[in-house]
Amino acid sequence: MTIIVTGGAGFIGSNFVFHMLNKYPDYRIICLDKLTYAGNLSTLAPVMDNPNFRFVKADICDRDAVYQLFEEEHPDMVVNFAAESHVDRSIENPGIFLETNIMGTSVLMDACRKYGIKRYHQASSDEVYGDLPLDRPDLFFTEETPIHTSSPYSSSKAAADLLVLAYHRTYGLPVSISRCSNNYGPYHFPEKLIPLM
């Protein structure tokens, strides 16, 4: 099994890489990361010498680079953690969020179609559901909660999710989407809540 993990030098992606290499030592894990402000190549130092790991510095928006990697590695699966992910940054510069989170996902989906990927997983965000009223502690989000975005970041993630679902419905591409809430743990980026405390 060969898995391309995009955004694998970031907080969640790197933890996923470590987990997969530990639990499935025979799997080949290919990490594709642009190494933006939130990517940290030194995080992956413990696995750099693993013969079943490969790091590729590339942008998911670069169609030629993505297709070349698919051509070289013939992946079975893609897990997309690559994203611009800070709400405040999305307010300052929404364009980069639209480019990476929507157009980058489009490039990955097209590559998955072309190369016959067995599974594509989109790591999304609970931000796509919007905000709950502070005076209603009895309310909570479920998988049936409608999308109700409230920032350029959440809108870009929701658009990517809808694109993934459209590729499933239109082309039969096997997909899954997870919408996790705030994560914390090893390799967390310093601007996030827990490291700031």
Model-derived segments and spans:
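Short, intrinsically disordered, charge-balanced linker/junction segments flanking boundaries
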Residues: L193-M197
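N-terminal Rossmann-like NAD(P)+-binding domain of SDR-like oxidoreductases, especially those catalyzing
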Residues: M1-N183
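Substrate-binding strand-loop-helix patch
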Residues: Y184-E191
